[in-house]
UniProtKB/Swiss-Prot annotation:
Taxonomic placement: Bacteria, Pseudomonadati, Thermodesulfobacteriota, Desulfovibrionia, Desulfovibrionales
One term of GO molecular function: structural constituent of ribosome
Keyword DNA damage among record annotations: no
GO annotation (BP), single: translation
Name of the protein: Large ribosomal subunit protein bL31
UniProt family annotation: Belongs to the bacterial ribosomal protein bL31 family. Type A subfamily.
Cofactor: Zn(2+)
A Pfam family per the record: Ribosomal_L31
């Protein structure tokens, strides 16, 4: 294997916008700032909301239905 091709790995402190901090390994530096983490992400907290896209699909089909018709 080649020598000196791997990036330097630091013990970093990850700081989230929600205030959560964790010790992680990083090649970016010693302080890493993130906007969202597993402590505040809706998927992990169970506060997900479902988005009803049925109306959007119907609008799309109605709008482009005339392009599929033959004259």
């Amino acid at each position: 294997m080649k020598d000196n091709i791997h990036p330097t790995v630091y013990k970093a402190t990850m700081n989230c916008a929600c205030g959560y901090q964790a010790e992680v390994l990083s090649t970016k530096g010693e302080n890493v700032h993130v906007e969202i983490c597993s402590n505040c992400h809706p998927f992990y907290t169970g506060k997900q909301r479902l988005i009803d896209t049925a109306g959007r699909i119907d609008r799309f089909r109605k709008k482009y239905a005339k392009f599929g018709e033959e004259k």
